[in-house]
């Protein structure tokens, strides 16, 4: 349908909705109009439609619709490069999504904001925009992983991840982080192929192709871009395909293949462009390429017979390349012109002009010394012409300046140029020389500049010389304009080739680089060097391969990158083709050509996860010791593949990968991995392996063979998870046009897809398409009659349903190529006559048209569940089986009945099965059933559309609540108990649905409670879903602790993969008060899982994450995941000790403190804090600590803070509330003598409430203790003091402390002096003071003597009052008053 026709239809439907007062329907149609207009580059008109949509949503009180309208307005403004306004609307979208607690829209909002920042970077190259884009995309990805995992269908989650991976890949490419860029692109391509996301696959391949092109990797770029072009062709997106052709033409020009570039540009021109500036650029580039092709053809003809003409053509080529900025080819053309000139012995002046052209071009290439050499040659050839010599000497001087030569080399050149200009009596040239000389002197020799400036002022310019210069410039301009006009005429003369038929163009592309030369029919190649056998292996055409080999096609030809047909068959997983090629002598261990990096067919198969192919190669003697250029053996290739795609592999694929690993290990150790004898290739070949015929002729397949064709065998041989490798596994992007057959997303239901490590090749669409193409008749005849009858009955049951049961149709543009389906019953049982009559013309369901974009560099932001907002949906057409009469009028598909649904509703409603076998063949159908009732049920953030089937028993509200609960359980893994409300009114469970609800009504479901299985079962289910084995110690902990108030899994050294199922099992453990995970390996990557679990634990009061390898990035994720939620609102104790947080975590720590308003204990021992701690984020941290009103205990021990950092820290602490402060070993070194000053100032603060102070291991001495004693009277609340492990504290300090305590109202409840230099004997009087002022004293010193122990023993019975106890063991002496 044409654009104008679609616009008219939508505008008509919009006007009808407006007259009917249906604001939601009108808003939905405004949305569709805006999307349609934007898809064709009419952004201003699209923006107006989205503004109307926003106003209608606001009037209809639809907050979610308003949010989406803001997003679309922001996207249109970004496309119009009004980025501040775009970000304003996108942040409004974010706020609305946040207020609605709609995680799906939150994910989209962050992705959209990230995309806009990426556009800003493209516009102004701001690194800050890149960092903001990265942060936004990471937030969006975290929401997908933490909030949406388990709540949406896996296909939608994969679509979201696909686009976010692509956006992150683009971001890291701009940040020049190549490794991360490549990883994200590979993940994006894998998920896009796995889920048939053609538009996202197009973007990923297109952008990866341009990245390879900019990096000079032309072979990889061509394959990625060809894959992108095929995706665009599959989607029937002409503008996207045109952009691919333009970039392909650029790559081909870089490679020097202008003939192929011409074909690509002509195709781009015919396909059209979305923007006029793009079309103008294509025209300009096409004119250039056409001119180059014409001149190259003329040069080829003239080289042998007309050297004079060839010399002229070389000059024209050089000028053409130079004008286009292709300076290396321009220099090459001028060099060839110079050789012809020397061959023809042309005059010196003529050759001098060629040297000038070469020098100028080398200067443009920054080869300034090379330019000087050609200027010197020009000088030699122009000897005696002082004017030309002057200009040449000036050029030499300027080139030497550009090369960075010293002033001593520049000055003589300028002087000679000035002298020649004076001899030629050219004042204007003299002035020019002096101006350049003056500029150089100011920079390199300032003392000589005044003299030159004086000469410049004295020099006058003659009027006639000015006129002469102007005349020369005018002549040069006219010449340039004449050249441009000639090029336009030239391009117009080439337009007659645009009428080529598609078949002729295909033949032209197949011949590719052969040009006019004749070659063998087996040497016909396309632009990538692929032969007919390559293409047949890529497309999986077994019979075509057999025919080619039987006719003598070489078995081992290479394409231009170096791949052989066997590589291709292994790459695409065509098992039977691999078997056939090996049977006929294909080289099993071929390492490929120059561009293949030593990848053998076995590496190739393992790199794509085709384990059956790899097993066959091993049977046939493939080497397991050969390594790629990166040093990878086949076993290491498999391990790398598993590591990359571990998260996306299903359990069956993991098992197969383990089995293949064992097989490779057995083969590497010399054991025979198979019972059958391995196939051995001949030790020598008589002919070149690239051109030798097959070793044995290909036998004709017997007509009565019982062996199933390839596709059938694939289904029989492998498990459902691997059935039909052409459709169940994504292929590498590679190669040219896809076959004419169609593809469908619906086929993926055959089993879980498997990932493939991709080398940069073009589209796998051909193979995916082939998976949808019905097989030959023999395939269909192999099915049994019972299977046919079962399929027939299932099809009949589906006819006449209220809703269409058709799965997603094939991509647009390929529906005509589908072969007709085979009959559902055997021929011998077929009824005579036409017994099936349709009440409407047969039509084929088509997929909704994917959203397009004008700029494919622009990353996508929306998720996969956005279909109802951006694509018009057509009502599924019904086909009824009639017996007595047929309907004369076809059913028209009116405007979409679901177009007015709010975003988030399922795009395809569920349909219940009709009861009974009412549609048996031969029975007339009764009257058509009434239309079904469909009810929308909102359960928290999820909206379900539930059909109520017609039956003899009318369903009740209780049935509807149960259906909604079951759907929520399937989506989220949690089973709620629900009550239903309609517009605030509570619906009674016993009421019948038709009595209280109408079709399309929306009811609100309130969760009264959750039906949670035991924690052990939840842990086991989580392990199964993640493909992770159960950890026995964790299982014991789960069984013992169950759903109690505390859970501990300490010191188990659990890694991230082992912690993930545990954290998921603990979700919604609402009664949990204490969670202890100390001594594990949480790391930064598992924090997202932790945050998701913490969000469901509202009662959590203690969280211990000590010694968990948590870094600054992990702390940042933890802090970012908490604000705005109820997470950790009840947390009272947090332990982050022994994690390498570092000085840069200040902002994250501040956010964490703000997110925990009731926090009373914070432990940060040994976190790697240093002197810079508190420096970069002093304001944020200070504010956070001051606002921590409930903080009672803070431990910063074992962090080498030093005096300055400690001072900043203590200055920010709340002195009036903090009771317990641990500062053990915080000195930066032994010489940190000022450490106690900030402590003294803190203790002297008015209202200081500190009760416990630990200062152990800080290199303190008696002087520090004396100063501390002065503060004891200022801080009467201090009752516990630990000064242990300070070996410079002596007995004098103890006496000083006891004397000070006598002046206080109360003594100390604890004094720690272990590891100090307290030396005995202390004397009986000192022991009396100890007993009077201290409730507990710890001494641990080798310097105590026997008299001290005797004095303590004598002291105990003589004192009345509370009892006392002592511990005297070796050097330890502990005293406590009970």
From Swiss-Prot:
UniProtKB keywords: ANK repeat, Chromatin regulator, Chromosome, Cytoplasm, Disease variant, DNA damage, DNA repair, Dwarfism, Leucine-rich repeat, Methylation, Nucleus, Phosphoprotein, Repeat, TPR repeat
Disulfide bonds listed in the record: none
Phenotypic consequence of residue 494 to K: In SEMDSP; uncertain significance
ANK repeat feature ranges: 528-557, 561-590, 597-626
Regions of compositional bias (Basic residues) in chain numbering: 514-523
Reported tissue expression: Expressed in heart, skeletal muscle and tracheal epithelial cells.
UniProt effect for mutating residue 539 to K: In SEMDSP; decreased function in double-strand break repair via homologous recombination
Biased composition (Polar residues): 672-684, 883-899, 907-918
Stated name of the protein: Tonsoku-like protein
The organism of origin for this protein: Homo sapiens (Human)
């Amino acid at each position: 349908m044409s654009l104008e026709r679609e616009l008219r239809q939508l505008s008509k439907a919009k006007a009808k909705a407006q007259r009917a007062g249906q604001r939601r329907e009108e808003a939905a149609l405004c949305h569709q109009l805006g999307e349609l207009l934007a898809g064709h580059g009419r952004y201003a008109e699209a923006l107006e439609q989205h503004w109307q949509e926003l106003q209608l949503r606001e009037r209809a009180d639809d907050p979610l619709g308003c949010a989406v309208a803001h997003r679309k307005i922001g996207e249109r403004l970004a496309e119009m490069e009004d980025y501040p306004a775009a970000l304003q609307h996108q942040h409004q979208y974010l706020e609305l999504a946040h207020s609605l607690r709609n995680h799906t829209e939150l994910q989209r909002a962050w992705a959209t904001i990230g995309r806009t920042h990426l556009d800003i970077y493209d516009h102004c190259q701001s690194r800050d925009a890149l960092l903001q884009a990265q942060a936004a995309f990471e937030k969006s990805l975290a929401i997908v992983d933490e909030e949406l995992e388990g709540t949406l269908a896996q296909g939608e989650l994969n679509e979201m991840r696909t686009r976010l991976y692509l956006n992150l890949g683009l971001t890291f490419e701009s940040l020049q982080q190549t490794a991360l860029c490549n990883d994200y692109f590979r993940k994006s391509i894998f998920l896009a192929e796995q889920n048939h996301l053609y538009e996202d696959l197009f973007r990923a391949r297109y952008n990866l192709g341009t990245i390879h092109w900019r990096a000079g990797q032309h072979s990889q770029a061509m394959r990625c871009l060809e894959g992108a072009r095929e995706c665009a062709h599959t989607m029937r997106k002409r503008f996207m395909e045109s952009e691919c052709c333009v970039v392909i033409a650029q790559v081909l020009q870089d490679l020097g293949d202008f003939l192929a570039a011409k074909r690509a540009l002509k195709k781009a021109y015919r396909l059209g462009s979305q923007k006029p500036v793009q079309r103008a650029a294509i025209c300009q580039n096409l004119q250039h390429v056409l001119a180059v092709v014409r001149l190259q053809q003329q040069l080829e003809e003239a080289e042998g017979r007309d050297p004079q003409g060839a010399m002229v053509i070389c000059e024209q080529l050089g000028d053409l390349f130079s004008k286009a900025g292709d300076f290396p080819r321009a220099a090459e053309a001028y060099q060839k012109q110079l050789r012809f000139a020397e061959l023809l012995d042309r005059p010196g002046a003529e050759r001098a002009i060629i040297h000038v052209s070469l020098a100028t071009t080398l200067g443009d290439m920054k080869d300034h010394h090379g330019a000087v050499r050609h200027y010197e040659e020009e000088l030699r050839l122009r000897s005696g012409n002082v004017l030309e010599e002057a200009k040449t000497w000036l050029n030499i001087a300027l080139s030497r300046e550009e090369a960075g030569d010293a002033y001593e080399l520049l000055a003589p050149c300028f002087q000679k140029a000035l002298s020649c200009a004076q001899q030629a009596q050219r004042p204007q040239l003299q002035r020019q020389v002096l101006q350049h000389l003056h500029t150089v002197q100011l920079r390199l020799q300032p003392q000589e500049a005044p003299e030159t400036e004086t000469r410049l002022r004295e020099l006058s310019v003659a009027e006639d010389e000015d006129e002469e210069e102007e005349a020369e410039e005018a002549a040069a301009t006219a010449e340039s304009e004449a050249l441009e006009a000639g090029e336009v005429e030239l391009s117009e003369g080439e337009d007659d080739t645009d009428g080529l038929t598609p078949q002729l163009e295909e033949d032209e592309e197949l011949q590719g680089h052969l040009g006019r030369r004749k070659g063998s029919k087996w040497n016909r190649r396309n632009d990538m060097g692929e032969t007919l056998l390559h293409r047949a292996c890529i497309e999986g055409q077994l019979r075509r391969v057999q025919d080619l080999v039987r006719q003598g096609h070489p078995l081992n030809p290479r394409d231009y990158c170096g791949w052989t047909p066997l590589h291709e068959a292994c790459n695409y997983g065509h098992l039977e083709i691999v078997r056939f090629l090996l049977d006929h002598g294909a080289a099993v261990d071929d390492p490929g050509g120059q561009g293949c990096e030593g990848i053998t067919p076995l590496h190739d198969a393992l790199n794509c996860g085709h384990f059956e192919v790899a097993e066959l190669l091993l049977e046939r003697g493939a080497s397991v010791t050969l390594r790629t250029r990166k040093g990878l053996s086949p076993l290491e290739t498999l391990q790398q593949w598993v590591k990359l795609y571990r998260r996306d592999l299903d359990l069956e694929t993991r098992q197969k990968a383990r089995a293949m690993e064992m097989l490779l290990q057995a083969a590497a150790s010399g054991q025979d991995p198979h019972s059958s004898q391995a196939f051995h290739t001949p030790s020598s070949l008589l002919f070149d392996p690239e051109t030798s015929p097959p070793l044995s002729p290909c036998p004709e397949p017997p007509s009565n063979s019982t062996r199933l064709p390839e596709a059938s065998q694939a289904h029989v041989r492998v498990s459902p998870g691997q059935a039909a490798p052409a459709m169940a596994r994504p292929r590498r992007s590679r190669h040219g046009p896809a076959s004419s057959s169609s593809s469908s997303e619906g086929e993926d239901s055959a089993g879980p897809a498997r990932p493939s490590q991709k080398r940069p090749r073009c589209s796998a669409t051909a193979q995916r398409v082939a998976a949808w193409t019905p097989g030959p008749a023999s395939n269909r005849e192999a099915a049994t009659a019972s299977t046919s009858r079962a399929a027939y009955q299932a099809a009949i049951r589906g006819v006449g349903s209220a809703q269409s049961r058709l799965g997603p149709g094939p991509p647009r543009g390929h529906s005509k190529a589908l072969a007709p389906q085979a009959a559902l019953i055997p021929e011998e049982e077929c009824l005579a006559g036409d017994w099936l009559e349709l009440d409407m013309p047969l039509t084929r369901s088509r997929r909704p048209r994917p959203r397009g974009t004008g700029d494919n560099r622009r990353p996508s932001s929306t998720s996969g569940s956005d279909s109802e907002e951006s694509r018009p949906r057509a009502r599924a057409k019904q086909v009824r089986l009639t017996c007595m009469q047929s309907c004369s009028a076809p059913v028209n598909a009116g405007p979409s009945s679901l177009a007015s649904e709010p975003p988030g509703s399922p795009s395809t409603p569920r349909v219940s099965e009709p009861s009974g076998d009412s549609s048996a063949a031969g029975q007339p159908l009764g009257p058509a059933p009434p239309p079904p009732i469909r009810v929308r049920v909102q359960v928290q953030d999820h909206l379900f559309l539930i059909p109520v089937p017609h039956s003899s028993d009318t369903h009740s509200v209780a049935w509807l609540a149960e259906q909604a609960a079951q759907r929520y359980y399937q989506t989220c893994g949690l089973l709620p108990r629900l009550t239903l409300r309609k517009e605030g009114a509570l619906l009674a469970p016993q009421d019948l649905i038709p009595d209280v609800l109408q079709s399309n009504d929306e009811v609100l479901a309130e969760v009264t409670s959750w039906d949670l299985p035991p924690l052990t079962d939840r842990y086991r289910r989580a392990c199964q879903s993640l493909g992770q084995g159960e950890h026995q110690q964790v299982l014991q902990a789960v069984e013992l602790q169950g759903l109690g108030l505390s859970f501990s899994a300490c010191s188990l050294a659990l890694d991230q993969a082992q912690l993930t199922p545990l954290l998921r099992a603990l979700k919604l453990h609402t009664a949990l008060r204490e969670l202890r995970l100390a001594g594990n390996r949480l790391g930064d990557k598992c924090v997202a899982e932790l945050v998701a679990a913490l969000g469901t634990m509202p009662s959590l009061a203690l969280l211990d994450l000590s010694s968990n390898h948590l870094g600054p990035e992990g702390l940042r994720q933890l802090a970012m995941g908490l604000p705005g939620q109820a997470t950790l609102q009840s947390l009272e104790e947090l332990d982050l000790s022994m994690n390498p947080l570092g000085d840069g975590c200040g902002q994250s720590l501040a956010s964490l403190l703000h997110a925990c308003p009731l926090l009373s204990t914070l432990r940060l021992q040994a976190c790697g804090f240093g002197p810079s701690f508190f420096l970069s984020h002093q304001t944020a941290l200070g504010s956070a600590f001051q606002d921590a009103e409930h903080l009672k205990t803070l431990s910063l021990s074992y962090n080498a803070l030093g005096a300055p950092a400690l001072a900043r820290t203590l200055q920010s602490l709340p002195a009036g509330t903090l009771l317990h402060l641990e500062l053990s070993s915080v000195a930066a070194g032994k010489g940190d003598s000022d450490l106690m000053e900030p402590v003294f100032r803190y203790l002297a603060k008015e209202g200081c409430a500190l009760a416990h102070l630990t200062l152990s291991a800080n290199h303190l001495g008696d002087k520090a203790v004396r100063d501390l004693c002065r503060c004891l009277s200022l801080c009467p609340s201090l009752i516990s003091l630990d000064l242990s492990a300070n070996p410079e504290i002596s007995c004098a300090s103890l006496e000083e402390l006891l004397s000070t305590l006598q002046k206080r109202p109360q003594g100390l409840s604890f004094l720690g002096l272990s590891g100090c230099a307290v030396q005995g004997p202390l004397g009986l009087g000192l022991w009396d003071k100890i007993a009077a002022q201290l409730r507990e004293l710890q001494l641990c010193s080798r310097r105590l003597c026997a008299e001290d122990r005797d004095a303590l023993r004598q002291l105990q019975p003589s004192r009345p009052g509370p009892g006392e106890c002592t511990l005297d063991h070796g050097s330890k002496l502990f005293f406590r008053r009970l």
